[in-house]
């Protein structure tokens, strides 16, 4: 037999961005509790609004199933006394398990006998277990939480009501003075209380009180109303999933309405208008079918269609004030030159241990010029780098960016164009913030890519130099994101920049600037290890096997595009028939070559058989061809060596008692091993 179960946590309005994750957490905790208590059920449905987190468990068993449990007790030598009777330890074990001594048996485990009991446990009634769900509710965690009243519980918002029902029965428990009942609350202004007769009635009972408890239904209702408005007005209202998710979690009964603003505000940069509407007011911007921004907006009301004109006028008034402020800020910004703005950067501290923004920009300039040298850029291009790095943070002191920080870079591009900077420089000012997320868009220009890489790597190394490094989940300065972003840009451009060497040079530059608190070699080692770990993430995103990741990073990880290519090619051929014997042969070379010592050069006159000469000839050919071979051709060249390597080992005693012969043979293998290791640390690859 089974019944439905309903649990609703009624709260003061939660921050919209935490509603979805909170109800998902509640679902998981309830599911885990049910499984731990061996209570079967068919499915769990979730409902959520800004004022409630709810789970409805369908077809929950009315009692646990009877089950057989086993328990292990003391060893036999402890369980029996000298006369073969049960000892106090054995009798105590029997009492603790609520069985008679006669029920005790022995079982051998790894040569030692232990007491065991097997007992049937009668399943408990579900109603007897459900009150402990109180701990599930109180154990929830949130990104933000608060105290209220005189209780000790920290929660996302104060709990105002609770429902816990199994079928028609109320499950009794209390949290912070709030007792469970079968009564919920409707819409704050339009609804009344709702008495739930049984769990399955919950959605409809709340709908009668102007609450759409199903978040997906609220979202779909908003989308349908947006599409209807588009069709009616011949507008285009672009779907923004983040904004749609947020407004869905801001309302309980959604009604879409439109408003207007003065056409003269369209003279502001489009990004300023859109940001004002979306980020500050949670409005949807309106476009024409030709993608032109129109002097209208769409918002979602938490209520019905009554007095929509009044609501629209109120929203228009708020937006008008916002746009008036933005227009003032924009006009003030146009009065100052870029150089005047740059001068103010020397008064802004980037970090107390790393100086001002002006000082950071000078360091980034040096890094960008290092990158330009690696890429053989011409002097004219380097002059663009110098101009760019002299100004690229200037918009941080503008009024618009002060009011709308999310527009940094975007406004820099616009102001730079207005003041006659080269388009390439203006675009790079915007692009240096990219990517803004792990999967975000990358810079599309070479200049933007250079400055983005330089800015990110200088930030990374700078913080390592003053011993500020990510620990566990803590990364307050986004250093993991900086490293990952820089590597994505390098890979996307296919630039064979020696990254580890570059990091070492940046550390030396930081020391020259007086920013290094730790020994330079220690910093170099730490930051290079950190970058290698980020490289692992890059390769994991390409679905590379973990052992192959270890192999290529253990080889030469210096140039990122080549590293990714090597990993992908190894991953592609790992199931090929020739792959295993090739890896085994190369691994044998690498392992024995580790015994090579000193600077012994190969002397062909010491060869004693044709197999030594054959391997030597193949290595000489590899030396000559290697630099011009593609990554896949290098792997083919190694595979072609397998027979020669096998013949060599079958017919040559490397560790000869003759020291001169031994050293000569180790030197030959060491030469080959150096090429293998540059490609990958083959002994890391699992071919068993």
Swiss-Prot record:
Keyword Ligase attributed: yes
GO molecular function annotations of the record: ATP binding; glycine-tRNA ligase activity
GO cellular component terms given for this protein: cytosol
Enzyme class: ligase
The enzyme's E.C. designation: 6.1.1.14
Keywords: Aminoacyl-tRNA synthetase, ATP-binding, Cytoplasm, Ligase, Nucleotide-binding, Protein biosynthesis
Subcellular location: Cytoplasm
Alphabetical GO biological process terms: glycyl-tRNA aminoacylation
Catalysed reaction equations from the record: tRNA(Gly) + glycine + ATP = glycyl-tRNA(Gly) + AMP + diphosphate
Quaternary structure and partners: Tetramer of two alpha and two beta subunits.
Family under the similarity heading: Belongs to the class-II aminoacyl-tRNA synthetase family.
Protein name in UniProt: Glycine--tRNA ligase beta subunit
Organism of this sequence: Listeria welshimeri serovar 6b (strain ATCC 35897 / DSM 20650 / CCUG 15529 / CIP 8149 / NCTC 11857 / SLCC 5334 / V8)
